[in-house]
């Protein structure tokens, strides 16, 4: 499996989460997920202000061969979406750990502890 950034947390459903200095959490899809999907052609991102629950599907990524839900790894409010990806979804393929999809202001930052570290994610992704 490709290099997994150690500073991120990972959901079993192949999303990554990165805690930012302002207390928000940026969310994207893993390299494993983008490889499985292939070339992305469209992203449907959640609306800013939307409330989400951990594990809830709130975005969609579409590739030339499939569409997949993207789940929020944390409960909270969507506070930003990466509008730059609307015209360039291929950035997710090129740089999955830089191309965040949306940011959540979590209700309980402790939910981050329920997510996997890089080694834990590597184990489930290789199954």
UniProtKB/Swiss-Prot annotation:
Tell me which UniProt keywords the record has, alphabetically: Lipoyl
Endpoints of the signal sequence: none
Q: Does the keyword Cell division apply?
A: no
Q: Which residues form the Lipoyl-binding domain?
A: 24-105
How does the cofactor bind to this protein, according to its record? Answer: Binds 1 lipoyl cofactor covalently.
Kindly give the NCBIfam families that the UniProt entry links to this protein.
Answer: gcvH, PRK01202.1
The record's subunit annotation is: The glycine cleavage system is composed of four proteins: P, T, L and H.
Q: What is this protein called?
A: Glycine cleavage system H protein
Please give the organism.
Methylococcus capsulatus (strain ATCC 33009 / NCIMB 11132 / Bath)
In the UniProt record, what gene is named as encoding this protein? gcvH
């Amino acid at each position: 499996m490709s290099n997994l950034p150690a500073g991120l947390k990972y959901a079993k459903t192949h999303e990554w989460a990165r805690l930012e200095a302002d207390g928000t959490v940026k969310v994207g899809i893993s390299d494993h997920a983008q490889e499985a999907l292939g070339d992305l052609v469209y992203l449907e991102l959640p609306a800013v202000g939307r409330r989400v629950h951990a594990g809830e599907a709130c975005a969609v990524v579409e590739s030339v061969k499939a569409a997949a839900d993207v789940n929020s790894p944390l409960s909270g409010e969507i506070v930003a979406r990466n509008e730059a990806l609307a015209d360039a979804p291929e950035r997710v393929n090129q740089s999955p750990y830089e191309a965040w999809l949306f940011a959540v202001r979590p209700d309980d930052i402790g939910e981050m502890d329920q997510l996997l570290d890089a080694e834990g994610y590597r184990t489930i992704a290789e199954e």
